[in-house]
A protein has these predicted regions:
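Nucleotide/phosphate-binding catalytic cleft detector across ATP-hydrolyzing
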Residues: 2-186, 203-205, 214, 228-276, ...
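Residue-level signature of catalytic and energy-coupling elements of molecular machines
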Residues: 59, 153, 188, 221, ...
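Generic beta-strand/beta-sheet core signal
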Residues: 60-62, 166, 187-190, 197-199, ...
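Short glycine/serine/threonine-rich phosphate/pyrophosphate-binding segments
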Residues: 171-172, 192-197, 314-315
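Glycine-rich phosphate-binding loop of actin/hexokinase-like ATP-binding domains
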Residues: 182-224
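Short beta-alpha connecting loops at secondary-structure transitions
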Residues: 205-206, 219, 269-273, 302-303, ...
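Feature representing long, continuous alpha-helical segments
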Residues: 219, 271, 275, 279-286, ...
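Nucleotide-binding motor/catalytic cores of P-loop/tubulin-like NTPases across gene-expression machines
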Residues: 299, 303, 307-334
Length: 334
């Protein structure tokens, strides 16, 4: 679904391809050849499952390189009736005043329109007006980073027809219209960052990127236990319980690291792992709460928080989040 046009019909999933990403870190391509290899492998998996080829794709990007700007645009309406062309013009005007040096605009998403003295208008097309204003979110990405992504796809024979920030695609995949109307925050815990998107009255009210994600938990475990990142990732996935250390009398156990890597001879306690991971997740949730406080919405969203992303798979994240955010919390599913 196009987040800028939610009235388009939903799509069906025909094929899925998942491979380990070795050429990208924090949303930036560090090894073009590895990136292209990963693309080719994942695309082949998806095409084999679907039984057809996909020469054209739309992609979503995440990472700390994406910037979010909030700005206004205003135009005169010569015909005294707002058309779709007028809406497009005023959205383009919203870019004025924003420094776009070495940046490319990915998407412009309207928050609300004003038609003369009428404010908080959702869809102004067809309304009588002499002046049209918009409050809009402008999503940008470093031009070089975008060009490298496009080149990688082109080199494996794929035409990129559209690019979306994952801050827009994740909520569209998991949130209902009712949730967006009543008030909800979508929290996308990725590897290098966490996306926060707030909706009320059916429109996006806030979007931000927190530069902390799941790989920080892995790094903390690697340092705390003195193991490799690969072993730490396996410990995080298989043994971490985010509320284990909060139990009144946790039944601790020693985990033999040789279960993961035969070269390892030490053990680590499940309680210690829980303490390491919980500290970092509490930091992420605290930073999310800071964003909600800026809106005056901390503990004040009726539909609560919906979690997505690889980092949301942590065991008992929902219980921890309910305590830290003081909101109803769930895992989001398409």
């Amino acid at each position: 679904m196009d987040p800028a046009n939610p009235n388009k019909p939903k799509l069906n999933i025909l094929g899925v391809g998942v491979v380990k990403s070795d050429g990208v870190r924090k949303g930036t391509i560090l090894d073009m050849e590895e990136f292209k290899k990963n693309l080719d492998e994942s695309l082949t998996e998806a095409e084999n499952m679907a039984g057809q080829q996909f020469p054209h794709v739309g992609i979503c990007l995440s990472g700390t390189g994406i910037q979010i700007h909030h700005n206004k645009g205003m135009i005169a309406i010569p015909s005294n009736e707002v058309t779709q062309e007028d809406v497009n013009r005023v959205l383009d005007m919203a870019q004025n005043g924003i420094t776009l040096t070495n940046q490319t605009v990915l998407k412009i998403i309207p928050e609300s329109f004003s038609v003369d003295l009428e404010h908080h208008v959702k869809s102004p097309v067809g309304m009588s007006a002499k002046k049209l204003e918009v409050n809009a979110y402008i999503f940008t990405i470093p031009t070089t980073a975008l060009n490298n992504v496009r080149k990688g796809f082109k080199d494996v024979g794929i035409d990129v027809v559209d690019v979306f920030p994952s801050l827009l695609t994740s909520p569209e995949a998991v949130l209902s219209r009712r949730q967006k109307e009543l008030g909800v925050v979508c929290i996308d815990i990725g590897s290098s960052c966490t996306g926060v998107t707030v909706f009320e009255e059916g429109v996006m009210r806030h979007a931000s990127i927190i530069p902390v994600g799941g790989e920080y938990v892995t790094s903390d475990i690697a340092l705390g236990v003195r193991v490799s990142v690969d072993v730490a990732e396996k410990l995080k996935t298989d043994y971490v319980d985010l509320t284990f250390c909060d139990q009144s009398k946790p039944k601790d156990e020693e985990i033999a690291l040789s279960r993961i890597d035969k070269k390892e001879t030490e053990t680590v306690s499940k309680l210690y792992l829980s303490q390491i991971a919980q500290a970092r997740y509490k930091e992420i949730l605290s930073l999310v709460n800071t964003e909600l406080k800026r809106l005056g919405r901390d503990g004040m969203l009726p539909e609560g928080a919906v979690f997505v992303g690889g980092g949301s798979k942590a065991r008992n994240l929902i219980d921890l989040a309910k305590s830290e955010l003081r909101l109803p919390c769930t895992i989001g599913f398409p």
